[in-house]
C-alpha cells in the first residue's frame, strides 16, 4: 500500500537532529499496539527521535483505552508535523476494518494488515522519508492467512528491499548472536547448513560489528553443530565437512573467527567479553542463551539490508494481549538502537 504523502528530501529530515523513525504496529491482535503506546509515553524516546506509528488508527485507540493512558492519537497528513509526548502520531496504512477484531486471536484481516504496515514502512525507508524502521511482532500464522509465503519478518524484508545476503542478529548488552539458519524446522536447518551460509553470515556479522557497533577488530566465535562440537567426529562430521572450511575462508578474508566452539560453553565466554559475536548454527542454539541472559534488553537487528531495521526480541504474546501487562522494554531498546544507528 502506497502512502499519499508528498515527496520529502533526505536533506529535510537530516536538518532535524532527531531522526524520523517508523514503528510498525505488527499484528493488531497481539501486544504490539499496547507496547507502542507504552513506549511513546516515555520522555527518553521523544528526546532521541520523532516517532511515526505505521498501523491502524482504531486499533491504536483501542489499545490506549485499554491502558487508560489518556494519550491522544494524531493522524498524520505530513511526516514533518510537530508532535509531542502524550501523542501517538499514526499513519493509517491499511484499509482493513479491524474495529471488531479480538485481542489474542488470529484474524485474516489482521494478517493482511500487518503485511501492509511493513510494506509502507519499507517504502518510507527506501525513499529516505524515515531514517529507520522498528517493527512490533507479527503473527506467522497471520502471514500464511494473508497469502504470504515468507516464514518471518527477516525474509520478507530481504525480499522487499532486494537484499541478496542478509542475517538476523540478536544484540544485547553482553551478547550478540547471529544464527546461520533461522525460521525452519531443526531437520531442515541441519540439512541446509552449508559452508557458504556460514561464510556469508560471518562476513555480514563482521561488517556490522565494525560499521554499526564501532568494534575495530571484532572476534567471532563459530559454534559447532553437534554436542561437544562433534568431539572429533564421534558425534557427527558436520564440523569437519562444513564448519571448519567456512572458518578458514573467513580467516582468509582477514576475519578473526574461532571455532568450531563447543556450544554449551561459548555463550558464557562471549558474555564475558572474549568474543564480540557468536555465529550459531540454528535458531534455538543462539536465541535461547541470549533470551535467558538478556530478555527485554536484546534487540533484533537485520543485517545486509539497504535500510536500518530493528525489532523486539519477542513475539505477539497472545496469552497476555489485551490485558495491559506486556512490557515495552524490548521495544524501547529497539527504538534506541535504531536511532543510534541512524545517526552513524
Which residue stretches match the model-derived regions?
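Contiguous, glycine/small-aliphatic-enriched amphipathic segments in soluble metabolic enzymes
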Residues: 2-153, 192, 196-281, 285-310, ...
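A generic local secondary-structure boundary/capping motif
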Residues: 79, 157-158, 166-169, 211-212
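Glycine/threonine-rich beta-strand-loop-alpha-helix active-site module
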Residues: 145-167
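Short, flexible loop segments at boundaries between secondary-structure elements
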Residues: 160-175, 305-318
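Ligand-binding beta-strand-loop-alpha-helix segment within the catalytic cores
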Residues: 170-199
